[in-house]
Amino acid sequence: MQFTEFWPFILYAGMVLVLVALIVGFSYILGQRPRERATDEPFESGVVTVGFARLRFPAKFYLVAVLFVIFDMEAAFIFAWAVAFRETGWIGYGGALAFITILGVALIYEWRVGALDWQPKGRKHKKHR
């Protein structure tokens, strides 16, 4: 291999480095320097903020987010199976059925242990008569 094969890549890498240096340099030159008390407050379109801006999300939020990702991946796998349904035959059908069954059992388990329950633990559902 000769140098002439690599010069476009070297030129591209050099241009990227120059562009990054320019962006960082302009940011440093034009950026805000003095740290005031208002710098740490969230921007609310000129409206004075009320309350504490750094709220903690309950762990339930993250659990539901993880469950969403898991079951969203299930949908992607089922879609891929549906596209290749004719090529996979009965073996593919059995595999997809086992996959859906396992994830269905996992969903029922998560529901039973309360992973999808957003109510505080002290409250019970009131039945309307």
Curated annotation (Swiss-Prot):
Major place of residence: membrane
EC numbers, comma separated: 7.1.1.-
Keyword annotations of the record: Cell inner membrane, Cell membrane, Membrane, NAD, Quinone, Translocase, Transmembrane, Transmembrane helix, Transport, Ubiquinone
Subcellular location: Cell inner membrane
Membrane-traversing stretches: 6-26, 63-83, 89-109
Gene Ontology molecular function, alphabetical: NADH dehydrogenase (ubiquinone) activity; NADH:ubiquinone reductase (non-electrogenic) activity; quinone binding
Gene3D superfamilies attached to this UniProt entry: NADH:ubiquinone/plastoquinone oxidoreductase, chain 3
Reactions catalysed: a quinone + NADH + 5 H(+)(in) = a quinol + NAD(+) + 4 H(+)(out)
Membrane topology note: Multi-pass membrane protein
Pfam families: Oxidored_q4 (PF00507)
Cellular component, GO, one term: NADH dehydrogenase complex
The keyword Cell membrane is assigned to this record: yes
Family recorded in the similarity comment: Belongs to the complex I subunit 3 family.
Function: NDH-1 shuttles electrons from NADH, via FMN and iron-sulfur (Fe-S) centers, to quinones in the respiratory chain. The immediate electron acceptor for the enzyme in this species is believed to be ubiquinone. Couples the redox reaction to proton translocation (for every two electrons transferred, four hydrogen ions are translocated across the cytoplasmic membrane), and thus conserves the redox energy in a proton gradient.
SUBUNIT field: NDH-1 is composed of 14 different subunits. Subunits NuoA, H, J, K, L, M, N constitute the membrane sector of the complex.
Protein name as it appears in the record: NADH-quinone oxidoreductase subunit A
